[in-house]
Amino acid sequence: MIKKKNKKRYTEVSALGKYIPMSTHKARRVIDQIRGRSYEETLMILELMPYRACYPILKLISSAAANGIHNMNFDETSLIISKAEVNEGPTAKKFKPRAKGQSYPIKRSTCHITIVLRDISLNEKYEEYIRKPWALLEKSNETEIRKRN
């Protein structure tokens, strides 16, 4: 079996929230509204939406942005949400006591939310390097030659 190595993209940061006690359908309703938008626009949208799923998603987006700003020196204004997905987590099964000694089963669903932010200001340079890696090397060699002369 041949394994393809993924080239790590240094223009992306992510945050993963696991076991969030919420239905995947309710979380996807919010995630679909913010996918592909800028970071600042997303914060405004999430603060004004009346859904309970907005708060954990807002915390995850803020965490991903903090990762990018602290670890990668990204700029807040150039961040966009490149990937946002909600996956189903494990379901906790409980019993609710009812009248006359009976009980009804209750399913408490959880979900895993993944947010990936991309810095679009660095993306152009990265794509240029992937297409023509020698072009950037030639530019750096020209500047060294100019400095010597």
From Swiss-Prot:
Keyword Plastid: yes
GO cellular component: chloroplast; large ribosomal subunit
Superkingdom of source: Eukaryota
Main location: plastid
Pfam family, one: Ribosomal_L22
Keyword terms: Chloroplast, Plastid, Ribonucleoprotein, Ribosomal protein, RNA-binding, rRNA-binding
GO biological process terms on file: translation
Keyword Kinase: no
GO function terms (MF aspect): rRNA binding; structural constituent of ribosome
Compartmental location: Plastid, Chloroplast
Family: Belongs to the universal ribosomal protein uL22 family.
Subunit structure: Part of the 50S ribosomal subunit.
PANTHER family referenced in this protein's UniProt entry, alphabetically: CHLOROPLAST 50S RIBOSOMAL PROTEIN L22-RELATED, LARGE RIBOSOMAL SUBUNIT PROTEIN UL22M
Classification via HAMAP family: Ribosomal_uL22_B
Function description: This protein binds specifically to 23S rRNA.
Protein name: Large ribosomal subunit protein uL22c
